[in-house]
Amino acid sequence: MRAAGKVGSLAYADRRRRFGFEYNGMVLHEYYFAQLKPGSSIDQAPGFKAAVTEQFGSAEVWHEDLVSAAKSRSVGWAIAYYDGTTGQINNHFIQLHEDGNVGGFVPLVIVDVFEHAYMVDWKALGRADYLAAVHKNMNWGVVEARFQAARSGQIFKRF
């Protein structure tokens, strides 16, 4: 549309308005799928595990907090972010794809809690079972790599 000289059109303005939703949806799905792998253990993420244990008291308590965010009465994403300023890991619920992302925070663990993620296999009331399956299939090596990159101020690639 830019090349066609339609930058001032309503259609172009609408595409710009929706760009954050569409693009962030793609990016968050890339993060989500990149971190899934059966047979991994949180022990493969020693730095991440130590950080959440120090901050939350244990990795299990951190996980319960993330699941609590994921069970919010809405659809969206549960994301464990790293705050590079404070060094803290924060669990957040993000509605849609672009609403609620914290500027400057780095996503470490991303859980898709839109219905399409669990309805086919776990049905309408199966969100808790789906969340357990995601945790069981988390690729903790990817989480550790994200954590180490974020902690050192590097930007990690989505895929």
Task: Tell where the protein language model's regions lie, with residue ranges.
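Feature for soluble, non-membrane regions of globular proteins
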Residues: M1-F159
